[in-house]
């Protein structure tokens, strides 16, 4: 045993108490294997065994932490990319200003009424690099919401429009609609980015965007408790998935979601013939549809 080159090398790098354990195990294994006259030396076999154990321990430690994902839907660096659709979906409650935004982002016929829409309005958005993307304005009525799962499954990004002048009164409804969008399986699995656009900033009664975010987070936190972990509407009743919004045991925050949720404000309608403050929307589309 003293002539073993392998054990002598181990003695240089390992503490004495570890070497005592190795010598003890060595003698046990050597005594056990001696009758079999194996062509492999005991110290080589012992080294191979220790190496195998070491590899298993390392793979368990780094493999489990590397593949760990938040059970609650938080972002992780090794998440598998899922191909998204190509549509830009404009969503929100009725009278939020969705159609006005569509008109000012696309080449849609300006004759389209900006009053409450009954059916979807469609157009084409042209990016800075001349890429043409379908853009869909989805009415806020219940009938249109029934077709929303299909629209979301084909979406590259979502613009959720809020009427900043009525948000305080409608905050619960806004949160309910947003909850259904964020817990939609396609939005969740494909990590479809969302921009919450606080519209009508040209009017004095518009609420501040930071307040909108804080109120929505509180409302969504309440909805998690009352509605559980499954979406209830949007045509998903027959195919419910266990999707929990945010991190369990902590107050809801948009930062806890797997997909990027941004906030911006502005006015979707032209003022004195000029369109104001929708550059954030254009930048959002540009960066999320590359």
From Swiss-Prot:
It is found in: Endoplasmic reticulum membrane. GO terms for cellular component: signal recognition particle receptor complex. It comes from the Eukaryota. GO terms for molecular function: GTP binding. SUPFAM superfamilies: P-loop containing nucleoside triphosphate hydrolases. It is a single-pass membrane protein. The keyword tRNA processing does not apply. One of its GO terms (biological process) is protein targeting to ER. The keyword Membrane applies. InterPro entries: P-loop_NTPase (IPR027417), Small_GTP-bd (IPR005225), Small_GTPase_ARF (IPR024156), SRP_receptor_beta_su (IPR019009). Keywords: Endoplasmic reticulum, GTP-binding, Membrane, Nucleotide-binding, Receptor, Transmembrane, Transmembrane helix. GTP binds at residues 92-100, 114-117, 140, 268. Pfam families: SRPRB. The chain crosses the membrane at residues 44-64. Heterodimer of an alpha and a beta chain. NCBIfam families: small_GTP. Belongs to the SRP receptor beta subunit family. Component of the signal recognition particle (SRP) complex receptor (SR). Ensures, in conjunction with the SRP complex, the correct targeting of the nascent secretory proteins to the endoplasmic reticulum membrane system. May mediate the membrane association of SR. This is Signal recognition particle receptor subunit beta. The gene is srprb.
């Amino acid at each position: 045993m003293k002539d073993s080159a392998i054990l002598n090398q181990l003695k240089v790098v390992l503490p004495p108490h570890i070497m005592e354990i190795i010598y003890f195990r060595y003698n046990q294994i050597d005594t056990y294997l001696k009758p079999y006259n194996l062509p492999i030396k005991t110290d080589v076999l012992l080294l191979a065994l220790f190496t195998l154990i070491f590899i298993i321990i390392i793979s368990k430690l780094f493999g489990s932490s590397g593949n760990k994902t938040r059970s609650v839907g938080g972002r992780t660096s090794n998440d598998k990319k899922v191909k998204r659709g190509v549509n830009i979906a404009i969503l929100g409650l009725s009278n939020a200003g969705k159609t006005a935004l569509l008109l000012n982002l696309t080449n849609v016929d300006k004759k389209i009424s900006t009053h409450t829409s009954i059916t979807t309005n469609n157009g084409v958005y042209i990016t800075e690099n001349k890429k043409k993307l379908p853009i869909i304005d989805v009415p806020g009525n219940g009938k249109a919401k029934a077709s929303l799962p299909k629209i979301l499954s084909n979406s590259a990004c979502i613009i959720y429009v809020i009427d900043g002048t009525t948000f305080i009164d409608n905050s619960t409804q806004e949160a309910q609609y947003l909850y259904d969008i964020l817990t939609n399986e396609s939005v969740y699995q494909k990590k479809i980015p969302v921009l919450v656009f606080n519209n009508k900033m040209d009017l004095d009664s518009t609420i501040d965007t930071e307040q909108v975010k804080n109120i929505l987070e509180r409302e969504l936190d309440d909805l998690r408790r009352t509605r559980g972990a499954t979406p209830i509407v949007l045509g998903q009743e027959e195919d419910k998935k266990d999707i929990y919004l945010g991190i369990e045991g902590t107050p809801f925050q948009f930062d806890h979601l797997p997909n990027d949720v941004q906030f911006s404000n502005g006015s979707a309608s032209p003022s004195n013939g000029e369109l104001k403050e929708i550059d954030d929307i254009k930048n959002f589309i540009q960066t999320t549809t590359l």
